[in-house]
Amino acid sequence: AWNKTPADLNDEDYTNFYRELYPMQFEESLFHIHLNVDYPFNLTGILFFPKLSPSMDMQKDKIQLYQNQVFVTDNVEGIVPDFLQMLKGVIDSPDIPLNVSRSGLQADGAVKKISGYITKKVADKLASLFKKDRADFEKKWNDIKVIIEYGMLSEDKFFDKAKKFALYPTVDGSYFTFDELVEKTKDAQTDKDGNHVLLYAANKDAQHSYIQNATAKGYEVLLLDSPIISHLMQKIEGGGEKLKFSRVDADHVDNLIKKDDTIISKLSEEETATLKPIIEAAVPKETYTVQLEAMDSATSPFMITVPEFMRRMKEMQASGGGGMMGMGNF
């Protein structure tokens, strides 16, 4: 099937080919990408986007490499970019050298061009699907976001292209591209120092009260829950703009997006000095630091927060231990 032109195949042909390749795979692929180029290198193939779990607990080695229709290997490391090794399918090229090391493959001129071509084709396909039927793309987002986010982290060219179709869902079920999100939130969510703050939650139920505090002020709260999102936020924040992500439970919302408004404490200094040691005696000193602040009357009297920087560093260390397909490189 991969040696035929796309014009000679219909959707049923691709479905049957996928079932033939993976007879034990009960779920159909989400969509496919047909590769067909003969200059400056020769490459044919069909790649399928499977439905993936957000956990990244999945197998690679699902893309089969052929040379002139003769099976060679299902290990395409060094040929196909890391983030695309989660796809399934077949590639066939006589221009890929065999019996060389991974470093040798990565240094080979033809392999570099093939890898770049595959990345571009995938990005173009995703952009086309987004433009053609955005509603359907949004429905599929949770099943494909890990691949896209991983690609944005590992491939700068893919990152630039993905800005047009990568989505940022909110806790109320809306989806925005990055540019749409920035435009919608820049006025309300810019603090007194000119920092544009994007608020997010990782768990709607566990962080419900914090989300309510933020949405009550008219702020958008994103729902970002993939295992590599901390890495991606770090990369976006490093883009040179005065923009940062803050999880809703990192502090009181008025501290996350500080405005010029000043809230006057209803407690005197003496009352504060009396109350603080009472609270400190009730919580483990090794775990919590007690801080008394003036807040608006709608706020809960007690809040437990974890500073954004500390929590994010822990999350990045946890996902960067080398157990997630090379994520230790980030």
List each language-model region with its residue ranges.
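Conserved GHKL (Bergerat-fold) ATPase module
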Residues: A1-F330
